[in-house]
Amino acid sequence: DYAAMDAVCTFLLFQKFENALVKNDRLYGVYKDILLPACRFLTDIQDIGVPFDKERLQTSSVLMQTQIDEAIEKLYTYPAIKEFEHNQGKDFNPNSTMQLRGLLFDFLGLKPTGKKTGTGAHSTDAEVLKELAEHHEVPQLVLDIRQKVKIKSTYLDKIYPQLDRDSRLRTGFNLHGTTSGRLSSSGKMNMQQIPRDNPIVKGCIKAAPGKKIVAMDLTTAEVYCAAVLANDKALMEVFQSGGNFHSNIAKIVLANDKALMGVFESGGNFHSSIAKIVFNLPCEADEVAEKFSTQRQMAKAVTFGIMYGAGPKKISEQVTKDSGEYFSMRQASEVIKDYFEQFHGLKKWLDDNKRFIQDNGFIYSHFGRKRRLPNVFSEDKGIASHEVRSGINFLVQSIASDVNLIGAVQAHNKIQEAGYADKMRIFALVHDSVLAEVDEDLIDTYQFILRACIQEDRGISIPNCPIGCDFDIGDDYSFGKFEKKYG
């Protein structure tokens, strides 16, 4: 009776909300053209499941436990821990937040970051430990242990008993789990939160014999979408000119910097060159990615901060925080000024949408999704500014996500129509990536189908320059990184 009533109530709610939706063409279009087809698609890929290697899962769990034991042993041999235990008269337990708080802030005298728990105590979460690790080794050791324990307990140990007889994990994907419209994942495993820094979990997602894991990632998708939305001719020409996008951007933005231009004329990369200048790195630009990857990532933060409408203060704070080196508001202001002097259309688009959000408290995406932003009316300027930035983020993130989702749905349908359902199986969408298990002799065909569907013109394309698709192919989802690290 309960199950039957659940279905009845759901249908009644459907009738109620459908009547409301049809009155708004944009929202009804999202429902009819995106959500309904995507719902059927996600049902299919959830049934397909994520392919795992049981033997590798077991081996990986043992490997991770060994690493945990080694990390704990290293922590306990550290002089500060021994002194703390002697003073306390008991063993130190890194899982005890009370003991950890006493060790870090009282015994070691590290300055609290200002972040507090719900009870008002100083926080010792991952963000805090990362910041404290800049001043002492112990927080990094504790963070390392926590991360390894989480990988083992949340993924390696939890996945194995939940696998079906065919060694596949059937988890969930949600169309309604985020405010940006991106997919979320829940159930047996959250596919959106698989560790990126450690390949051990990805390495356990393994194709069956005769098949390969194929991952398609959109390249520079959000910048691409912003260029089209803003109708910024100069920014679109950067894509149309081919070559390295970020290098081309730098050639335009920093055209008056003769020293920097010399780097680009010899094949430099935008983010690497920016990092070399901003952080005064003792190497050539083409060596930055290998020797100073962190600084290069910080340089990227400047570029994307500009695109999302972050001001000098926000960019200065973010780069300073992430890099550990002071990046002044003056430096941030100069970069923003140079950027917008070249890309007038992007600046106008950002300004127009900021005003619309501030006036209305909502914004629509290109495909018709509506993001409600009531906090723009907050009397707290910080909260209001953050809400505006969230709206700008939504405009580009939701479109890139929808391009990926719509393309994947279309590709899945074409694959079934062509009779390849058992030979090309999309099993997950992770951020802006489409994952599939494909027969080795049909990989080229699969790439052709998916690329054509992703790059189809849906009113968000640059003429003669479709959005970029990068493909990775391998026996497992780590694409060789698992074997390289663990043998």
Residue spans of the language-model regions?
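Conserved "right-hand" nucleotidyltransferase catalytic core of DNA-directed polymerases
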Residues: D1-I200, G210-K212, T219-E222, I252, ...
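Structural motif
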Residues: D1-M5, D25-I34, T219, Q240-N244, ...
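Hydrophobic alpha-helix feature that most strongly marks membrane-spanning transmembrane helices
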Residues: Q46, V50, V62-Q65, D69, ...
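Conserved catalytic core of nucleic-acid polymerases
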Residues: D47, R170-T171, L175-H176, A250, ...
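Short, contiguous acidic/charged loop-to-helix segments that flank catalytic cores in large enzymes
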Residues: I159-D164, K202, A215, M236-F239, ...
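Function-dense linear segments that define catalytic or interfacial modules
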Residues: G172-E284
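Interdomain boundary/hinge elements
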Residues: F239, A332-V335, S461-D472
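C-terminal structured "cap/appendage" subdomains that terminate the fold
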Residues: A418-D470
